Curated annotation (Swiss-Prot):
Organism: Shigella boydii serotype 18 (strain CDC 3083-94 / BS512)
GO CC annotations on file: periplasmic space
Gene that produces this protein: msrP
Family: Belongs to the MsrP family.
Catalytic activity, as annotated: L-methionyl-[protein] + a quinone + H2O = L-methionyl-(S)-S-oxide-[protein] + a quinol; L-methionyl-[protein] + a quinone + H2O = L-methionyl-(R)-S-oxide-[protein] + a quinol
Name used for this protein in its record: Protein-methionine-sulfoxide reductase catalytic subunit MsrP
UniProt superkingdom: Bacteria
Record carries keyword Oxidoreductase: yes
Required cofactor(s): Mo-molybdopterin
Cofactor note as given: Binds 1 Mo-molybdopterin (Mo-MPT) cofactor per subunit.
Length: 334
């Protein structure tokens, strides 16, 4: 495995830029004006989630046992843990980047059930302990690129998805893998009301081609920075596909289903002209409302240190994954 290229420590994201972009997305979905039409009582009920003192704090993640294979270690400057866990998109808990950390303590992650079904010879179910004990865990330092044109470098902990799928024995009919987030509106305010959750249809769903899911880079992730995932990062288990935009990294997964047909995906359903099924990081294919040619790295510096850097094709993993898309028009299949 080739070492990844360096990112500059001083590259930091200007949050105001992306807050404006998020508002543009919500406007396109028709959320802003509709939200203003809510009666006062409804506003009070919704905003009660965000008052602060009545929300349980997120539990501290437990230390995990894991290896550090040399192939997945590198000298990339890491994004500090407070930014990894404090600057998140998880609309089930609100739209601002700080909302998930503030509100996700309500999510109960133990007990937990993850079911693998569909076009498999041996359907199976994992419980909470299985997620950290059934497979050897390893730390992998990956780039993470958001579709909003900001990026991080994160030391995720998990196991390759292909090991889990191998246990289920996909049949010859399996062509795709569909993922689903837990549906728990009593714990997730964004699922309870469309104005908190950005107007998306829940539960959140995602999908990969089977060959993408079986690729060694694709990681079922249970930890970060040496500890179990905090709720705002997708506890107890989430998907990391480092060559794709971050919205493909579905969080708090309860179902993995192998299918014959391409499964629906949440952001593609919401805005198919803006968010494709593949969502491969590509500096040559812009979002309709902003460029993807460059990105801002969230590092250890402050706002005055902001610098842009070029976006790398497949987020810097082209040597490993470009062959998956040989002959595929990446502009048409974005």
């Amino acid at each position: 495995m080739k070492k990844n290229q360096f990112l500059k420590e001083s590259d930091v994201t200007a949050e105001s830029v992306f807050f404006m972009k998020r508002r543009q997305v919500l406007k396109a979905l028709g959320i802003s004006a509709a939200a203003l039409s809510l009666p006062h009582a409804a506003h009070a009920d919704l905003l009660s989630w965000f008052k602060g003192n009545d929300r349980p704090p997120a539990p501290a993640g437990k230390p995990l046992e894991f290896s550090k294979p040399a192939a997945w270690q590198n000298n990339l400057p890491l994004t500090p843990v407070d930014k990894v866990s404090g600057y998140n998109n998880f609309y089930e808990f609100g739209l601002d980047k700080a909302d998930p950390a503030a509100n996700a303590g309500s999510l109960k992650t133990d007990p937990w059930t993850l079911k693998i079904s569909g076009e498999v010879a041996k359907p199976l179910t994992l419980d909470h302990d299985d997620l950290t004990r059934r497979f050897p865990l390893e730390e992998r330092i990956y780039r993470m690129r958001c579709v909003e044109a900001w990026s991080m470098v994160v030391p995720w902990i998990g196991f390759p998805l292909h090991k889990l799928l191998a246990l289920a024995e996909p049949t010859s009919n399996a062509k795709y893998v569909a993922f689903e987030t837990i549906y728990a509106p009593e714990q997730m305010p964004g699922q309870q009301d469309r104005f908190i959750g950005g107007g998306l249809k829940y539960p959140y769903v995602e999908g990969l081609r089977l060959d993408e899911a079986m690729h060694p880079l694709t990681l079922m992730t249970v930890g970060v920075y040496g500890k179990a995932l905090p709720p705002q990062n997708g506890a107890p288990v989430r998907l990391i596909v480092p060559w794709k935009y971050g919205f493909k990294g579905i969080k708090s997964i309860v179902s993995i289903k192998l299918t014959r047909e391409r499964p629906p995906t949440t952001w593609n359903l919401a805005a198919p002209d803006e968010y494709g099924f593949y969502a491969n990081v590509n500096p040559h294919v812009d979002h309709p409302r902003w460029s993807q040619a460059t990105e801002r790295f969230i590092g250890s510096g402050g706002i005055l240190d902001v610098q842009r850097q070029p976006t790398l094709l497949f987020n810097g993993y082209a040597d490993q994954v470009a062959s998956l898309y040989r002959g595929l028009d990446l502009r048409e299949n974005f």
